[in-house]
């Protein structure tokens, strides 16, 4: 299935518009963020950001199949196979086959191609009109020079999605006026500054907070020293932020460092991580926690996001010479 998806994405990539950035070789998050951030007059534009609710599982297969057939007209056997796969209502759940509305099977490699294909017409419409727009699977952002024009384009999106049997997640809709911060794909942009989005900062801080509490309980239960608990915290977040050799998830370094041009959010995360480490090492939230010095953290293996960020860009500058 992975090989089939790879071949589909490569062979039929010309079907897709350049304003689509999901699951495309050499045309992904970095290209999306930079295209938007460096668009002429971007700081004078109004924006609208939307997230399609439960996109993969909500795509009506009966509406998708005609699009798929048109996309691969010279592959009747492949279309027949994919049709049977998509129309089969049975799924495995707890080892049992049960009927379910599965859409295009979120989590299946094939779903990435189908998710790109289903809204390709919307992408093409915005491209044809030369309207600034970007889509990454179920995330859409559009821009316009006036509030009235923005509303007109928003209505096109709402109407198109309704015709496609899709809904927008109202909790993830946002609008901005010229000069205000807009967010797309985890990056916040304002006045030429690209930073980690506030929600992404809060998510990593929440993970640090939960891990600190878990390690405190573990240390109490196993009679582990505070310093060893702090060392465990450092090991976990070094792996999550920088290394991650086991998981397929992108680390912070791989995802954010090429995209941002400020260390503002990294300073905030560093400061919070150091608070957690001090709390674990000293078993206190008071000022006495500062008796555990930064040099001691480094001896335990702590790596600052800010330092690693500047090292990354220093190496990149050297590679560009």
Predicted regions and their residues:
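Conserved two-metal-ion catalytic palm core of "right-hand" nucleic acid polymerases
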Residues: 1-69, 73, 79, 90-93, ...
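Right-hand nucleic-acid polymerase module
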Residues: 2, 95, 99, 124, ...
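A broad, low-specificity signal for short, low-complexity segments enriched in glycine/proline
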Residues: 6-13, 101-105, 147-151, 233-237
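Conserved polymerase palm-domain catalytic core
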Residues: 18, 33, 38-137, 141-160, ...
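Short, intrinsically disordered/low-complexity patches at protein termini
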Residues: 24, 72, 159, 207-208, ...
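Conserved phosphate/pyrophosphate-binding and hydrolysis machinery centered on Walker-type P-loop NTPases
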Residues: 26, 103-104, 108, 259-266
């Amino acid at each position: 299935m992975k090989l089939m998806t790879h071949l589909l994405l490569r062979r039929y990539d010309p079907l897709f518009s350049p304003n689509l950035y999901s699951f495309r070789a050499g045309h992904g998050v970095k290209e999306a963020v930079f295209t938007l951030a460096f668009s002429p007059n971007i700081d004078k534009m109004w924006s609208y950001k939307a997230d399609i609710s439960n996109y993969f599982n909500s795509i009506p297969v009966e509406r998708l199949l005609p699009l798929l057939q048109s996309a691969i007209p010279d592959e009747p056997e492949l279309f027949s196979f994919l049709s049977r796969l998509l129309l089969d209502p049975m799924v495995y759940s707890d080892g049992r086959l049960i009927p379910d509305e599965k859409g295009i099977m979120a989590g299946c490699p094939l779903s990435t191609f189908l998710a790109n294909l289903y809204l390709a017409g919307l992408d093409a419409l915005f491209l044809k009109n030369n309207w600034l727009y970007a889509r990454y699977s179920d995330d859409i952002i559009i821009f316009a020079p006036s509030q009235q024009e923005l509303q007109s384009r928003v209505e096109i999106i709402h109407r198109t999605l309704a015709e496609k049997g899709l809904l927008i997640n109202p909790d993830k809709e946002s609008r901005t006026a010229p000069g205000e911060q807009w967010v797309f794909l985890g990056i916040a942009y304002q006045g030429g500054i690209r930073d980690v989005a506030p929600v992404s900062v809060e998510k990593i801080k929440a993970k640090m907070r939960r891990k600190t509490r878990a390690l405190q309980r573990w240390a109490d239960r196993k009679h582990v020293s505070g310093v060893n608990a702090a060392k465990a915290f450092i090991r976990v977040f070094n792996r999550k932020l920088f290394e991650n050799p086991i998981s397929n998830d992108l680390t912070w370094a791989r995802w954010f460092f090429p995209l941002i041009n400020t260390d503002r959010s990294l300073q905030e995360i560093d400061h919070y991580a150091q608070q957690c480490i001090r709390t674990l090492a000293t078993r206190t939230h008071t000022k006495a926690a500062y008796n555990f010095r930064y040099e001691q953290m480094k001896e335990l293996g702590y790596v600052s996001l800010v330092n690693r960020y500047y090292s990354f860009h220093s190496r990149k500058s050297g590679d560009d010479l």
